[in-house]
Amino acid sequence: MPKIFTDEEREALRIKLMERGFELLKTQGYKRIRIEALALDCYIAKGTFYAFFESKSEFRHQIMLYERQRAKDALLTYTDEDGKLSAKGLYQYLRWLFDENPNVFAYLTPSEQQYFLNEWPSGYIEHEDTDHATMNMLCHMLRKPRTDARRECACNLMKMGAAALTVPNLFLHNAWDETLDLLTQQIVACLTEQEID
């Protein structure tokens, strides 16, 4: 990359490209994203885009990783001053996840999802150790975790919610919000003894 950007400017531009790319993915779908238009949107040349990302496919992977990190960072905003997560904080975070839906898969067509799964490194998408680590981290952050926490059930419920968000047209629209609310309450009940205030 030419030295026309400082390291800070380079990182800010990389983030801008990913955020704008995710917006386009949500509104237009993956196949309709045009690198030329995205670069123009961010006031750079198409060639400069490829100094950040080797290909459109790598760009999509980086968006996914960025959104996952953004979701992890958001979790910290729901903790108390001592870094602990109350039942209410966990509930609010999970609702943010479902409402914000930073899951790239939710915006891909079924054929794009399959293509993406086939080219992603083996074991990355479905990795049991990662699932266990995530649930252990959540329980460790909780103010009052259940001694008999049902981590695997909570993990599956979270994945069910994420999967449901990829096909919202299968569900009754009028009960969607209440359904997500019940799902979220059940996840919280699997992990903490505290009531949601």
Q: What name fits each language-model region?
A:
Residues 1-28, 32, 37:
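Basic, helix-initiating cap at the start of DNA-binding domains
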Residues 43-53:
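Short hydrophobic/aromatic patch on the recognition helix
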Residues 53, 110-119, 159, 163, ...:
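Short helix-capping/turn signature of helix-turn-helix
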Residues 55-60:
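Short amphipathic alpha-helical segment with a characteristic S/N-K-E followed by hydrophobic residues
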Residues 62, 76-103:
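Hydrophobic alpha-helical connector segments
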Residues 64-72:
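Short, basic, alpha-helical segments at the C-terminal edge of helix-turn-helix-like DNA-binding modules
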Residues 100, 140, 148-151, 155-177, ...:
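Amphipathic C-terminal alpha-helical segment
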Residues 116-156, 178-181:
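Amphipathic alpha-helical packing segments from all-alpha helical-bundle domains
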